[in-house]
A protein has these predicted regions:
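Bacterial N-terminal signal peptides
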Residues: 14-25
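Generic short amphipathic/hydrophobic targeting helices enriched at N-termini
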Residues: 8-9, 16
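Gram-negative and organellar
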Residues: 29-476
Length: 476
């Protein structure tokens, strides 16, 4: 209890200090825009399988009352946005979980020079329950890019997360910290000719001993070169070292590919590709030979569709069986605007690695993910959406031999009968199926209805549609 009170006290002091700074700047600079807006939100949530179990499912109703504040500070090359949302949650069946929770977020956009852009975000919650069904996450992130010369750019980022969530491998809930740092440099030496180097470092540390904890670093390089206006090549090489906290079976992986590109139009290329992967570990080496054919369709600045088909030839130096498997390559994101009122967003990806991010200890992993979301403006103040997604994870090593399938379907309505009043209704259905004994199948239905009172539009910018925001909504 003492730590919780200390955390709440720290949040109040931190928030008050930031607000004082915001208002101080607003008087100091005539061009500064500062805004403080209170909001009131009442939410009712129903879940027919709160603990996501196969048997003995638990229904739960949760009523939330939130009084939040948002503040914006805009001045020349600096934009800051602060959100503070205290909330009281009332559980119908799990009475011991009733209580207040506090959420604080701080977003910043900085342009320290003409050639440098930096974005930062902090998100903190006082929620610290460590019980099944509860999830929370505290994050801090910074992303930046600097243009060194007319043709050379440097990108850099750091992401930190401390969370309590459900583990893919076992279905149990665990607390862990994730640190991820990346840096990359790219040089463009022709209209479509590029080359670059990247490096990433990642640490996933569990509070209690866990087989999925790891440390990883990954240098890589790439080049794309068009020999003629219609014929080109691209290639990439990478090294990946994964060091497990609870195992001596660490993995070193060397990968590389080369593609022949044939341009059919300004936005459409076909390709022939060969990729090779070689992994070393104490339990046995692994070779993957992967020829494929496909196409790249650049549909816009931030959207593209890349599809291919090939065969994975796997050779193992252990008890795992060699295999020849058909594999569909997929990397797609596109928004189709079919009318002034409606749009369809699609996303999809596939891949394979010797140790995945979400269940590293399960070893060699193949995955497919695809989803879509349909948005439609039914009336001026009434909008709707429908979404669906499918995820498949395969862990084919002989001592694991596991396949997980997740189907998610849902939709929602948003109605603003008055400028200061918003009503939202959403529904989501999740079906999880697995062939492992480590965790059970489950289905879950969740309904959320909320009423929000907001006196005016905040200066907080409306987030632009992005692939990451779409996938966060339809996959999670």
């Amino acid at each position: 209890m003492g730590k919780k009170k200390y955390g709440q006290k720290w949040i109040v002091i931190w928030t008050s200090t930031l607000l004082i700074l915001f208002f101080s700047y607003s008087f100091a600079f005539s061009r500064t825009v500062t805004q403080l807006i209170p909001t009131l939100t009442i939410t009712e949530e129903y879940n027919d399988n709160y603990f996501q179990t196969e048997n003995n499912t638990q229904e739960e109703y949760i009523t939330s009352y939130g009084l939040g504040f948002s503040a914006g500070f805009l001045y020349k090359k600096i934009n800051l946005y602060l959100g503070y949302n205290p909330e009281y949650r009332d559980y119908k069946n799990l009475d011991d979980r009733d209580g207040f929770e506090h959420y604080v977020s701080l977003d910043g956009e900085f342009n320290p020079s003409k050639y440098t852009n930096i974005n930062a975000r902090l998100a903190y919650t006082t929620k610290d329950d460590k019980e099944s069904g509860e999830t929370w996450e505290n994050t801090a992130a910074i992303y930046g890019d600097t243009q060194f010369t007319q043709n050379t750019n440097l990108d850099y980022s750091h992401f930190y997360s401390k969370s309590f969530d459900q583990q893919l491998r076992t279905g149990t809930y665990n607390e862990h910290e994730l640190n991820r740092a990346t840096v990359g440099i790219t040089n463009q030496f022709g209209k479509k000719d590029r080359m670059g180097l990247n490096f990433s470092y990642e640490l996933d540390d569990y509070k209690n001993s866990n087989a999925d904890g790891y440390t990883r670093y990954n240098p890589s390089g790439f080049i794309t070169y068009w020999i003629t206006p219609l014929n080109g090549l691209d290639s990439q090489i990478a090294y990946r070292n994964t060091d497990f906290d609870e195992s001596f079976d660490d993995i070193e992986t060397y990968t590389g590919h080369i593609r022949y590109l044939r341009k059919f139009s300004e936005l459409f290329d076909g390709y022939l590709k060969y990729r090779h992967s070689y992994s070393q570990r104490d339990s046995g080496d692994h070779h993957i030979y992967h020829p494929s054919v496909g196409f790249d369709w650049e549909t816009g600045t931030d959207s593209h569709i890349s599809l291919g088909i090939g065969i994975l030839f796997s050779e193992w130096d252990n008890d795992n069986d060699d295999s020849n498997d058909l594999f569909f390559e997929m990397d797609a994101y596109k928004i189709f605007h079919f009318s002034k009122r409606g749009s369809l967003s699609i996303t999809g990806s596939s891949g394979y690695s010797e140790a995945g991010d979400d269940a590293a200890s399960l070893g060699y992993n193949l995955y497919y993910k695809a989803g879509l979301k349909l948005n439609y403006q039914m009336q001026k103040r009434l909008s709707s959406n429908l979404f669906g997604s499918y995820q498949r994870d395969e862990f084919p090593e002989s001592d694991i031999d596991r396949t997980d399938n997740i189907i998610t379907l849902g939709g929602g309505l948003s109605w603003s009968p008055l400028q200061w009043l918003r009503l939202n209704l959403s529904y989501a259905h999740t079906d999880f199926d697995t062939n492992t004994s480590q965790r059970g199948d489950y289905t879950e239905n969740k309904v959320i209805f909320s009423v929000r009172f907001i006196p005016s539009q905040p200066v907080w910018p409306t987030p632009e549609s992005s692939r990451q925001s779409l996938e966060n909504e339809i996959y999670n």
